[in-house]
A protein has these predicted regions:
Chain B
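Hydrophobic alpha-helical
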Residues: 103-123, 191, 205, 209-271
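Short beta-strand elements in bilobed, periplasmic/extracellular small-molecule ligand-binding domains
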Residues: 71-83, 171-174, 192-213
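Flexible loop/hinge segments that line or gate small-molecule binding clefts
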Residues: 111-149, 168-171, 265-274, 278-279, ...
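Short beta-strand elements at the ligand-binding edges of bilobed clamshell
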Residues: 79-81, 135-160, 174-175, 206, ...
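Hinge/cleft segment of the Venus flytrap/periplasmic-binding protein
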Residues: 26-45, 175, 179, 183, ...
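Extracytoplasmic "Venus flytrap"
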Residues: 28-65, 69, 73, 77-91, ...
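Short, solvent-exposed amphipathic alpha-helices that sit
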Residues: 58-73, 150-157, 182-201, 215, ...
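Hydrophobic alpha-helical segments within soluble ligand-binding/sensing domains
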Residues: 34, 89, 143-170, 186, ...
Length: 369, 338, 704
């Protein structure tokens, strides 16, 4: 600790400047996400899953198969559920796992679901899942207190009650492998059997060894945005969807207990200050001074509440490349990204769009590596 | 004033009367009214000492002696230390004039700087005693060495050693202090009074050391290089001349160069005589000066005459200390005085 | 909750947090801290030294100050020029020598001695000046070297003349007068010092050489680019330093009539301490005679106080050294952080509670529609910042731009435009006077008048200063909108007195009544503040009764009505409260209605923040301005209200792409024209069912 930091530490932090990591270095903004091919428009499109039978995606209460036709794609409904789908995962043998809000996990194939209702966990906040090679299913529970759609409330309450549990390959037995996480929102298996988990509210990626009781180990910290779902990249890397930006104002509100409590108590969550999946046209939405439209132009670097960001990490977990849709764009709220047959797809939940990314650099862990 | 005096006498008389009454039972001696007056008059008076600087033998010695008497007779004694700065000294003196103590003991950095201010101080009713270094203004009293006499004695000693045929040569060097100080101005006069009668003595160097032993050392160093056959040297102050002496010793000419210096006669100076660094040490005896100073302070504080009305001075006797007569009686340490 | 809110409101009403920031904006604040230090030192001295306050102390101080202060002035001038003069002490000694040799040794007349002394100082200063100004040597090293050189000269000459100097006293009444004399109890030397100091102050602060000196010291390159002879200016600074030092030396000589080997030694440090302590910035360009004097008095009191405390001399010097370090440290930190501190503390939010917004259904008059989504655009990309729009009797359209011009779009199609007038500041509110002159409120300037031929004249740029305001509120900072009463009086709003045009949005964060309504009477030429303490008063429009006016209080989301004439004169009442957005300009519409342009829409989160001033203050301090919470001004909305204050229509730009943040409207012949202060276009949209012949001019002044 430097002397300056030490001196500052002696005084209450009430006036200290708040900073968030800058979009810089590997996260230097570009427009690649905004300019990516928009294959399909599908409201509430969310989680992508690669199956032997093709690419699947969830949207609302339904499950679709994506059929690409060159520059466009169509979505064919293959299953419907009673409540919104919160995650989709697919095993190597073609088995699917679908999290349904308040209705457990459905494992199997469309039409032949086996329902598992994990005991002792919040079944309405199953945010992500992934199958291990032995058929074990790992599922993230964002929060013990709130359903998935109330993620904002969990953030504002400083939620750190998330868990990851494993579902046995045959008997469907459930076992918690990690808890006390701040909204685990994505899971992917690393080559060595460990799990990579995105911990949204702590802006970081941690790894968990499901076979040991060791504490989660952070491999990527201080992300400039809130991470969401993860998926393996060819060559051993990791795809990372980041669903909303971090802003100084959000961090301030998160520190301002009195203001935040009253905001939560008296104001509709849609109007709260905090991250969003998409920009809103409503006139009652909060705004930051830098987001004021000047001379007919909204600056791309304006501190917007939503943002589009996808990043790819190499096999060591170091980010190598990023795709952005900035304040003046609309491909915001990326919740899922996956690689299939050399193509990379991402879902902009904020705008309800399926995107195909133009992947570029090759550093040994790339999409085309 | 007269009324006051009368009242005072009356009071003394009353006290004496009661004394007689109470003493009638048993003889307990007589109270000396003069002693009481002496003490009463001095009590609560304010004496300020303005030295060149504190932190060296002379001023510390005088201060110690003066402080003792102040303690004994219960008057206040303060020191304003300008730390060798004439400017700070004048400022101190100026503020003393507005502060109006009863008496200032001034130690002049040179014979001019304080001269007018001392006159002003007396005009403002402050009695002024100058100590050891005079100024152009004669004040109520001066206590200290007669620098002319020191100069004459020093020159005479050098003449005795360096007259033609007596020493290696007739070359003599003089290290002065601050050219405008009384110790320089008047001592040089004394020196040249003697030297002028002995035209064979050559003065090869006369430089100011600003009381700085290091400067004195380097001056003597240079002189000895230019005049390896130097016979005698007159230094103006023992503290600075430790430098002169060390240059002589370093050149290995301790036995060749006859060094005369003067000072307050403290132990260090005496030791230097013993070591043979100084060949003749003319001491103006700080403890003695201190006592005379004390007597003058008491006299002036008791005196009814106003400041500057009568001007006296006393040049105290000097002691020539050589190896032969270095003894306890001639030398002092600060601890002795405290 | 209610009780704590009430407490909060009282606390923000009665504790004037804003004053601290306002004080910091004052330029004299640089002097305040040294002055406070001086007062503190004096108080401490009075406390610990009995009898410190006396006539003697002051005349004593005055005498010392005359010499010390002159040298401090000398050093101040050099430091102002961006340099430093360490040789003042040695120079001083040489000049003393010159004076004493002239007087005591050579027995010259006082005038000649003075000339000789000044000449000595001049030559010494000139040497420094040439070396530093023309040969571009480093000031520090150069004057360090000349310090040694001058001292060596002194040491060589002094012993040779010492006895002669002390041996004689000149007989000269003038000399004695300078040294000891006093005039009505004031020492003569002090009078000389005061005269010189006043002269130096005038030269430094009011005359060209002083400005040039500061410019050179502040930013040498800029000064050079501005055509200032940098070399000469620097050189002259050192010459001035030499001459002032010589003057001080002359006074010193007259006072003491003597000199010692140590004269001037250590003076540079004492004087440097004084100057820096007084607030002269070592970086150059900042400082004044006042600083030098304050610092000198401080150091003199400190040193004489310490001497009177019978401190050992070395301790005095140690203390002075520590004081110098502290002063230098403070100076560096202060110069660096004053702006930062000001930024941090200037914003001073207050409690502002707006009524709860009602939730509105689809059928509500305020429901979002897109009637402004497809406007006809005028001057897209040609105008920047058309805050207000107005049309003349010939249907030409006028608007101000942030480039400082008023642009005229020509009827009938408004495809062609021309610069009607160049103002120099951003014209905001516009209104036609009955004689056809266009009146405009210009941000940062005042109210101006443009004749039909395009000639610009100032109407007013100041009002009466309020007694208790710390910041000077007599100048107009942000006049916003105006209207003309039937008798020709101009009523205009000044949105805020605390912020400049470019920072108007910051005022939203404060939510305090920083604005006012002002009236200018062209008959008497006087301008008086009518109402103050208004919360961002914005649009002004005269009601049809000719006795009252409506004005918007933007951050309070309300429209007020104020009677300036007639039986209700002086009455102020709320016309329309709890608007869904922040009202900007108000304009008359056809059928006796009024148009209200909404600058932005309220958000519940911002409303909540307005009730939490401490939160907003922390926001202003902790996060970047771009991230500050703001009303939603990315949507556009215009309201139409009846004469009785009922909202009868609302026109929205739903996406906010063409007309976010509408700041003004103007109805003209069945069309509604829209302006926006941060927009680059003007829009017009047809108003269904409006009188196609109705014009604002006609409504005000009758049809032609």
């Amino acid at each position: 600790m430097g002397l300056g930091a030490f001196v500052r530490g002696l005084f209450p932090a009430g006036d200290a400047g708040i900073s968030v990591p800058a979009m810089d270095g590997i996260f230097k903004p570009n427009n690649r996400l905004e300019e990516a091919e928009r294959l399909l428009s599908l409201s509430a499109i969310d989680n992508l899953a690669v199956t032997p039978g093709g690419l699947l995606c969830s949207a609302g209460t339904r499950l679709f198969r994506i059929e690409p036709h060159g520059a466009t794609a169509t979505a064919v409904e293959i299953a419907g559920f009673s409540a919104p789908v919160t995650f989709v995962a697919s095993a190597a043998d073609g088995r699917l796992a679908v999290g349904v809000e308040g209705d457990g996990i459905h494992i199997g194939q469309p039409g032949a679901w086996r329902r598992i209702d994990p005991r002792g966990v919040n079944g309405s906040c199953l945010t992500a899942g992934a199958f291990a090679s032995d058929g074990t299913l790992f599922v993230c529970v964002g929060s013990r207190e709130h359903p998935a759609r109330d993620w904002k409330r969990d953030l504002m309450e400083g939620g750190a009650s998330g868990e990851v549990f494993a579902v046995g390959p045959t008997d469907g037995s459930c076992r918690v492998v990690a808890s006390g996480l701040a909204f685990p929102n994505g899971v992917a298996l690393l080559g060595d059997g460990r799990l990579a988990i995105s911990e949204s509210w702590r802006h970081r990626i941690v790894t968990i060894d499901p076979k040991s009781a060791a504490r989660p180990v952070a491999i990527l910290e201080d992300l400039p945005a809130y991470p969401s779902r993860l998926s393996p990249a060819s060559g051993g890397g990791l795809w990372m969807a980041l669903f909303a930006p971090r802003r100084q104002l959000f961090e301030l509100v998160l520190r301002e207990d009195d203001y935040r409590r009253e905001m939560m108590a008296t104001i509709d969550p849609d109007e709260w200050i905090g991250p969003e999946l998409a920009g809103s046209a409503r006139p009652d939405q909060p705004l930051s001074q830098g987001s004021v439209r000047q001379m007919g132009v909204l600056k791309p670097w304006a501190p917007s509440r939503s943002y589009g960001l996808v990043a790819r990490c190499d096999r060591n977990g170091v980010p190598r490349e990023s795709w952005h849709s900035r304040a003046d764009g609309s491909m915001h709220g990326i919740t899922s990204v996956c690689e299939q047959g050399g193509d990379v797809y991402a879902t902009s939940r904020g705008s309800g769009t399926l995107l195909r990314l133009a992947a570029a650099a090759n550093d040994g862990g790339s999409a085309h590596g | 004033m007269r009324l006051l005096k009368t009242t005072r006498w009356l009071a003394v008389a009353c006290i004496a009367l009661t004394g007689i009454v109470t003493a009638s039972a048993q003889d307990k001696g007589l109270e000396n009214p003069r002693s009481t007056t002496f003490r009463k008059t001095l009590e609560g008076k304010k004496v300020v000492f303005l030295p060149l600087s504190m932190g060296f033998d002379l001023t510390e010695g005088w201060a110690a002696v003066m402080r003792q008497q102040a303690k004994r007779l219960n008057y206040s004694f303060e020191i304003r230390d300008p730390a060798w700065s004439t400017d700070a000294g004048t400022k101190a003196l100026q503020s003393l004039i507005s502060e109006k103590p009863d008496l200032i003991v001034a130690h002049n950095p040179d014979i001019q700087s304080y001269a007018r201010l001392l006159a002003q101080a007396q005009a403002a009713g402050i009695k002024v005693v100058q100590i050891n270094l005079e100024s152009n203004t004669q004040t109520d009293s001066y206590v200290g060495a007669d620098w002319t006499e020191i100069g004459e004695q020093a020159a005479q000693a050098v003449v005795d050693k360096c007259s033609p045929g007596k020493g290696v040569s007739t070359k003599v060097a003089i290290d002065t202090g601050v050219p405008t100080a009384a110790s320089d101005v008047f001592q040089l006069d004394g020196i040249y009074r003697v030297l002028n009668q002995h035209p064979d003595i050559q003065v090869v160097s006369q430089q100011a050391t600003e009381y700085n032993p290091e400067k004195a050392r380097s001056i003597m160093d240079t002189v000895l290089q230019q005049h390896p056959d130097l016979c005698g040297a007159i230094g103006i102050w023992d503290n600075q001349d430790t430098g002169t002496a060390s240059a002589i010793q370093q050149a290995g000419k301790g036995s060749q160069v006859f060094l005369v210096t003067s000072g307050g006669g403290n132990k260090v100076g005496c030791e230097n005589v013993e070591n043979g660094l100084f060949n003749l040490y003319i001491s103006y005896n700080v403890p003695l000066q201190g006592e005379i100073l004390n007597a003058e302070i008491a006299r002036l504080l008791l005196s009814d005459s106003s400041a500057g009305e009568t001007k006296t001075l006393y040049f105290n006797p000097l002691t020539q200390i050589t190896k032969a007569n270095v003894n306890q009686r001639n030398c002092w340490t600060l601890d002795d005085l405290k | 909750m209610a009780a704590s809110d009430a407490l909060l409101r009282l606390r923000y009403r009665f504790v004037p947090d804003r004053l601290f920031g306002e004080l910091l904006t004052k330029s004299w604040i640089d002097n305040v801290i040294p002055a406070l230090a001086l007062v503190a030192t004096v108080l401490i001295m009075v406390w610990i030294i009995p009898g410190f306050v006396s006539v003697g102390t002051f005349s004593d101080l005055a005498r010392q100050l005359s010499e010390f202060g002159l040298v401090a002035l000398a050093l101040t001038i050099v430091i102002l020029s961006g340099g430093i003069d360490l040789s003042v002490g040695s120079m001083f000694a040489l000049c003393v020598l010159a004076a004493l040799v002239s007087m005591n040794v050579l027995g010259l007349p006082v005038g000649v001695a003075l000339a000789a002394t000044l000449a000595t100082g001049l030559v010494c200063g000139l040497l420094n000046g040439v070396l530093i100004g023309y040969l571009r040597l480093r000031a520090f090293i150069t004057t360090l070297v000349t310090l040694v050189i001058y001292r060596a000269l002194y040491d060589i000459i002094f012993p040779r003349v010492a006895s002669a100097i002390v041996g004689s006293m000149p007989v000269s009444p003038t000399w004695d007068l300078i040294g000891f004399g006093s005039f009505r109890g004031v020492p003569v030397s002090f009078i000389i010092f005061v005269l010189i100091a006043v002269g130096a102050h005038i030269v430094l602060s009011r005359l060209r050489p002083g400005w040039r000196l500061r410019a050179v010291g502040g930013a040498r390159r800029s000064a050079y680019n501005a055509g200032i002879n940098v070399k000469l200016t620097v050189c002259l600074a050192y010459v001035a330093s030499g001459v002032l030092t010589a003057t001080a030396a002359f006074l010193f000589s007259a006072r003491l009539g003597s000199t010692g080997a140590d004269t001037g030694i250590g003076m540079e440090i004492a004087v440097l301490t004084a100057v820096v302590l007084g607030g002269v910035s070592l970086g150059g360009g900042r400082g004044s005679v006042g600083n030098a004097v304050i610092g000198s008095v401080l150091v003199l009191i400190l040193t004489s106080g310490l001497i009177r405390l019978s401190m050992p001399g070395s301790v005095n010097q140690l203390i002075l050294g520590l004081v110098l370090i502290a002063a230098v440290l403070f100076d560096a930190k202060w110069v660096k952080n004053r702006g930062k501190l000001l930024n941090k503390v200037y914003i001073s939010p207050t409690y502002l509670k707006l009524a709860e917004q009602t939730t509105r259904g689809e059928q509500d008059v305020l429901a979002v529609n897109d009637r402004l989504g497809a406007t006809q655009l005028i001057g897209l990309g040609q105008v920047e910042g058309p805050e207000d729009v107005v049309l003349d009797r010939d249907d030409n359209l006028y608007t101000g731009t942030r480039h400082g011009t008023i642009v005229r779009f020509l009827a009938p199609d408004y495809a062609r435009s021309e610069v009607f007038a160049r103002i120099g500041g951003h014209p905001l509110g516009l209104a036609f006077a009955p004689n056809g002159d266009l009146l405009t409120c210009v941000g940062g300037m005042g109210v101006y008048r443009v004749a039909p031929d395009g000639k610009v004249a100032k109407v007013t740029d100041e009002t009466n200063r309020s007694l208790l305001s710390v910041i000077d509120d007599s100048r107009l900072r942000l006049p916003d909108d105006l209207d003309v009463a039937p008798d020709g009086r101009i009523f205009f709003s000044e949105a805020t007195i605390r912020y400049e045009m470019s920072e108007w949005a910051v005022d939203a964060l404060e939510g305090r009544g920083n604005g006012r309504l002002i009236c200018h009477d062209p008959k008497t030429g006087s301008t008086r503040t009518v109402l103050r303490g208004l919360i961002f008063p914005n649009g002004v429009t005269i009601c049809r009764d000719g006795q009252s006016l409506l004005f918007a209080e933007t951050w309070a989301c309300r429209i007020n009505r104020y009677w300036f004439d007639g039986p209700n004169k002086g009455k102020l009442e709320i016309f329309l409260d709890n608007l869904p957005g922040y009202p900007d300009n108000l304009n008359r519409g056809s059928d006796g209605t009024y148009w209200i342009a909404l600058l932005g829409m309220r958000t519940r989160t911002f409303d909540l923040a307005m009730r939490k001033p401490a939160f907003r203050r922390r926001m202003a301090r902790r996060i970047a301005a771009d991230e500050w919470m703001f009303p939603n001004i990315n949507r556009g909305c215009v309201l139409r209200v009846s004469a009785s204050g009922e909202i009868i229509d609302a026109l929205w730009d739903k996406a906010g792409e063409n007309h976010p943040s509408i700041t003004s409207t103007c109805e003209h012949k069945g069309w509604l024209y829209l302006g926006g202060v941060s927009n680059n276009r003007i829009g017009r949209v047809r108003i269904e069912g409006a009188d196609p012949e109705w014009t604002s001019q006609g409504d005000y002044w009758g049809r032609r």
